[in-house]
């Protein structure tokens, strides 16, 4: 069992959460003006890097609020969690979390 830190409720079981994709992806200002290729890039093209990755999560089995997290995709370890709308935190060089 893995615990995920909800910024509103505290640590909870991973089964209470749902993954929401890459964080900090801006919605197009005028989606109707996009070509099919540009729209498909917005919808489907995301980073797929190994290491620290900013992600969106929702506490679907709890407060039902969205938040962002920095997670190491190689180890699954959550390095930091922060509320939606807040800037991405800087991690210190020792791998500490917020």
From Swiss-Prot:
Zn(2+) binds at residues 6, 9, 59, 63. It comes from the Bacteria. It catalyses: sarcosine + (6S)-5,6,7,8-tetrahydrofolate + O2 = (6R)-5,10-methylene-5,6,7,8-tetrahydrofolate + glycine + H2O2; sarcosine + O2 + H2O = formaldehyde + glycine + H2O2. One of its GO terms (molecular function) is metal ion binding. One of its GO terms (cellular component) is cytoplasm. Keywords: Cytoplasm, Metal-binding, Oxidoreductase, Zinc. GO terms for biological process: tetrahydrofolate metabolic process. It is an enzyme of class 1 (oxidoreductase). Its EC number is 1.5.3.24. It is found in: Cytoplasm. In the presence of tetrahydrofolate, catalyzes the oxidative demethylation of sarcosine to yield glycine, 5,10-methylenetetrahydrofolate and hydrogen peroxide. In the absence of tetrahydrofolate, catalyzes the oxidative demethylation of sarcosine to yield glycine, formaldehyde and hydrogen peroxide. Belongs to the SoxD family. Utilization of tetrahydrofolate is probably the physiological reaction since the products are substrates for serine hydroxymethyltransferase, an enzyme which is part of the sarcosine oxidase operon. Heterotetramer composed of subunits alpha (SoxA), beta (SoxB), gamma (SoxG) and delta (SoxD). This is Sarcosine oxidase subunit delta. It comes from Corynebacterium sp. (strain P-1). The gene is soxD.
